[in-house]
């Protein structure tokens, strides 16, 4: 068997692809800064660049900044140091698999990032002096960053879609689990890999197609299929015990250099969700009891982030408070706020406060009702507050108190949780972590008005609980900021 081992090209994991993209984007941003400084120097027609940087970093300038005589964020050298960071923040949504592998979506994302960057700089331009900001330099940076990032991303997509990197997948099992993957493959239009078809021992299924993918044969022909169709990955999509002959064929394929993956792993990669309807109880126990524990260092860092974010959020809240209060008062009268009891980590009860966005009689019968898209109970001011997430700002107080986190599943009412846990499997697993102001489910899915939609949102929540890290928390926060800027909230 060892003589038949294939020499397979080096293939990278999705997380490694994202790391390569991040490093490439950062390098192009740094190169763009250098090119922008050079362009500004040439445009100025004299060697002003070195003088500009030297003046900005001089002891006298630093002393004025430290004494609060000059705001540091309006100083040119600091702006140029921050430009790569700001650009990377604007690109955060381009790391999603369905975007990173698409030239059209990548081009659109870079164009939006450049537009937002130009708009933000235009606002600063109004309040700055000519000597504070090198306007030609910043404009040149946006141009260079857009073109270089686009060029680098197109090269990456071309390499990513090459035969050496593009996986060819064969699904083991044409039952509900396998068909779910096939349906996702067709609906998402992903082309970061090819699903060739199914292998199944059910004679009645052989020769049929499910979601345009054929059942190509039984497991006794697995090795032949692997060679004939240059299969790189086998995805086991069988619920229950794998039969001995099928199991041996899978092991033989692994010895030939084929990667073996379980259905839930590919599902997570494709959707950013956990397939709750295709999991067995022992898998849930392993993933959400044993592996769900994270390091104490992460918990400490997350709490520190919550405290800092809570203070910043409260400052912003106090700034907007009189304006929002006046708008609500004029539009729909009192009260300005409303409060509710929610369940936190470990089912602990606490009270949240939000700006009121619905009519006073939204739940006059006292029965909890789910919010809907274009909900008629939402006021005009409330619609704006929801789209910009400003209605959530009073909850920064809950974050400071430790009842909530900046990032986590949405906090729900006890009566809704009691109802959902009877209909949706593993629903109470959401209570393993603190609820959040924003979260993986909130940025990826809108309103839910049915049990089916609730299940999808739960799949996002459980994915976050399983994979939560500080980089993921930062990604969610940055995408939420983008939602606020674009007014695309729920």
Q: What are these model-derived regions, one by one?
A:
Residues 57, 401, 415, 422-490:
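C-terminal terminal-structure detector
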Residues 1-28, 32, 100-105, 151-318:
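N-terminal hydrophobic signal-anchor/signal peptide
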Residues 1-165, 193, 490:
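Signature of alpha-helical transmembrane segments in polytopic membrane proteins
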Residues 203-206, 267-280, 284, 338-380, ...:
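Short, glycine-rich, amphipathic interfacial segments at transmembrane boundaries or analogous
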Residues 110, 114, 165-185, 335-358, ...:
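Membrane-cytosol interface motif
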Residues 297-362, 398, 470, 475-490:
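A hydrophobic, helix-centered structural microdomain
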Residues 29, 33, 113-122, 310, ...:
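Hydrophobic alpha-helical transmembrane segments in multi-pass membrane proteins
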Residues 371-434, 476-484:
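A short, structured surface patch at a secondary-structure boundary
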């Amino acid at each position: 068997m060892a003589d038949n081992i294939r020499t397979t090209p080096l293939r990278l994991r999705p997380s490694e692809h994202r790391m390569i993209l991040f490093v490439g984007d950062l390098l192009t941003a740094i190169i763009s800064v250098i090119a922008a400084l050079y362009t500004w120097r040439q445009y100025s027609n004299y060697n002003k660049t070195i003088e500009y940087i030297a003046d900005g970093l001089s002891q006298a300038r630093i002393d004025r900044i430290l004494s609060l005589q000059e705001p540091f964020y309006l100083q040119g050298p600091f702006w140029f140091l921050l430009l790569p960071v700001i650009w990377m923040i604007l690109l955060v949504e381009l790391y999603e698999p369905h975007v990173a592998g698409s030239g059209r979506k990548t081009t659109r994302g870079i164009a939006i990032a450049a537009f937002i960057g130009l708009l933000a700089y235009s606002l600063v331009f109004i309040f700055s002096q000519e000597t504070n900001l090198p306007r030609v330099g910043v404009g040149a940076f946006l141009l260079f960053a857009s073109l270089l990032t686009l060029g680098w991303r197109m090269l990456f997509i071309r390499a990513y879609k090459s035969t050496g990197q593009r996986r060819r997948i064969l699904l083991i099992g044409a039952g509900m689990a396998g068909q779910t993957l096939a349906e996702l493959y067709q609906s998402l239009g992903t082309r970061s890999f090819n699903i060739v078809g199914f292998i199944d021992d059910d004679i009645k299924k052989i020769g049929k197609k499910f979601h345009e993918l054929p059942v190509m044969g039984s497991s006794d022909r697995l090795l032949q299929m692997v060679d004939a169709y240059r299969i790189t990955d086998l995805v086991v999509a069988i619920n229950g015990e794998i039969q001995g002959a099928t199991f041996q064929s899978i092991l033989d394929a692994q010895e030939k250099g084929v990667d073996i993956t379980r259905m839930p792993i590919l599902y997570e990669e494709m959707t950013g969700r956990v397939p709750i309807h295709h999991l067995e109880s022992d898998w849930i126990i392993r993933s959400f009891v044993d592996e769900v524990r994270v390091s104490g260092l992460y918990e400490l860092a997350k709490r520190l982030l919550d405290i800092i974010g809570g203070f910043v959020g409260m400052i912003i809240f106090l700034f907007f408070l009189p304006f929002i209060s006046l708008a609500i008062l004029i539009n729909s009268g009192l009260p300005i706020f409303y409060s509710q009891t929610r369940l936190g980590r470990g089912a602990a009860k606490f009270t949240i406060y939000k700006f009121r966005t619905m009519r006073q009689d939204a739940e006059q019968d006292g029965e909890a009702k789910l919010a809907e898209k274009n909900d008629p109970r939402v006021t005009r001011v409330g619609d704006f507050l929801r789209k910009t997430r400003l209605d959530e700002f009073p909850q920064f107080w809950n974050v400071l108190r430790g009842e909530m986190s900046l990032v986590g599943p949405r906090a729900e009412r006890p009566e809704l949780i009691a109802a959902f846990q009877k209909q949706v499997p593993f629903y109470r697993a959401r209570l393993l972590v603190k609820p959040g102001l924003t979260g993986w489910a909130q940025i990826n899915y809108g309103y839910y008005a049915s049990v089916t939609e609730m299940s999808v949102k739960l799949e996002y929540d459980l994915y976050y609980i399983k994979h939560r890290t500080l980089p993921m928390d930062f990604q969610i926060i940055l995408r939420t900021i983008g939602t606020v800027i674009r007014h695309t909230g729920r």
